[in-house]
Amino acid sequence: RQLHINRFVPYGRAKTFENKLNMEQFYKWVDRGYDFLRNIYINYYKQNKEFIFNIDVSNDLCNQVYSKGRKTSCGVNCNQISIDSNGNVYLCPSLHIEEFELGNIRTDNITEIMEKSKQKYGEIDVEMLSKCKNCEIKYYCGGGCRAIAFNETGDLYGQERNCDNYRNRVFDLMLQ
């Protein structure tokens, strides 16, 4: 069994509607869905049932709480790339922005593209994110979504606006 739900990342045309969204209502909706899915995951976990469970909408909180040691929240510049229909390679599916274009698989060697990316961006982990360095849950959280941080701050290494709410969610899960 497998469940995968993508996160809401306001970028591109969706960014123009971001200010029109009632974020309080949006997060209440996300929380209701998150609570429902969290209960499913906890039940599977307690029963030792195998279940591939990726909840990007809540940044995969359940898996993170039960697997300490994460230095990244995803595979950005580590084991993930995104390729568009023209062969352009990007750091992340949510960062299809010219600034983050790494090369093109039609004209460039994929190994060289990855090496160039590592040289340009280094390892993007909680140890290099200034707001995360002293955070008590950094190895559960992994530093949050780099695409959301970039879209909110203009900085790939910035902090998501929702960081404090996220930290509280992790603590709530730990107490269950």
Model-predicted segments: where are they?
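Flexible mid-to-C-terminal extensions adjoining Fe-S/redox cofactors in radical SAM and related proteins
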Residues: 88, 94-176
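Radical SAM enzyme [4Fe-4S]-AdoMet core and its adjacent flexible, acidic
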Residues: 1-80, 84-86, 94-105
